[in-house]
Amino acid sequence: MVDLLTGESPHLAGYSIVRADDGLSVKRRAGFEYLHKAPYLKNKLCEPFVVTAPYLEEEQDKPIHLSRHQGNELDYIISGRLRFAYESHVEELGPGDVALYDSSRGHGMIAIGGEPCVFLAVTIPGPEII
């Protein structure tokens, strides 16, 4: 992924340090801000992002858009509140809460509570969806 975004291949071996305000900005979902926190580490088994979900009043009473991608995902809430949908299940998460799930199934989220939600999202590749 980093090769496509920057033209530079991951080149760090063993470990990577990325400071609090640093990382590679990635466009994934409209309105959400994704900051890749280990873009240049070679041979990593997961992709860590700090994600900011904006609070949008117009989303609050609508069904949450569900997406799918291969593997698993772990979302750790840092600040704010998140309404998390996994297929037909809906949960509300706050600071310190964690969701770990099979991301090949429908999942989505929106910020709630009148403010953005910041969370650590770690995607872990898995088998391709057939």
Give the location of each predicted region:
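Short C-terminal boundary/hinge segments that cap the last helix of small helical domains
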Residues: 1-15
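Flexible, glycine-rich phosphate/dinucleotide-binding loops
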Residues: 11, 43, 128
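A short glycine-rich, His/Asp/Glu-containing loop-to-beta-strand
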Residues: 23-65, 72, 122
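Short acidic-glycine-tyrosine-enriched beta hairpin
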Residues: 37, 87-104
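A short beta-strand-loop-beta hairpin characteristic of the jelly-roll/cupin
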Residues: 60-95
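Hydrophobic protein-protein interaction segments
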Residues: 62-63, 101-103, 130
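Catalytic core of Fe(II)/2-oxoglutarate
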Residues: 103-114
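Double-stranded beta-helix
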Residues: 112, 117-130
